């Protein structure tokens, strides 16, 4: 069964407010990564990796995890959401500068250290976030307890061709 945000009564875990949030300066201060945490500050750590590229984190995703059991860390990747500079502003060139998969993997690890997460994390990613989650797990296997992937997009040539040539039917 597909559950939308409108199906609030069907979700097992309630919407909660973050207990902490802030910005992490990366790349000598030229980028600031927004982060927020939900659930139990002493719980099993989960890092949520949003899709895109160009998307942003959504507090709704924290509802996948029991707030009594898990410490859910969300962040907006460089150029996305509340992170600065934003690709949706006039700072597009700045947002894209030093913004590669390697930079994002480093940001995830810096964020883990910044938030004092010293045990392996569950890594939860969707769409482009699944690709970034896999890349993080390859780069830092000792920091990953499990991978939870949804809507997997692997950035293979055939995936990209299918994605860029997707057309919707139009009315005649």
Task: Locate predicted features.
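N-terminal targeting or regulatory segments adjacent to alpha/beta-hydrolase or S9 domains
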Residues: 1-11
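N-terminal cap/lid segment of alpha/beta-hydrolase-fold proteins
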Residues: 11-32
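Conserved HGGG/HGGXW glycine-rich cap/lid loop of the alpha/beta-hydrolase fold
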Residues: 27-85
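Cap/lid segment of the alpha/beta-hydrolase catalytic domain
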Residues: 79-102
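Short aromatic-enriched loop/helix-cap "lid" or pocket-rim segments at secondary-structure transitions
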Residues: 85-87, 158-163
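Conserved acidic catalytic loop of the alpha/beta-hydrolase fold
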Residues: 103-120
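Conserved hydrolase catalytic core segment
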Residues: 120-158
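Conserved small/polar residues in nucleotide/adenosyl-binding loops
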Residues: 164-170
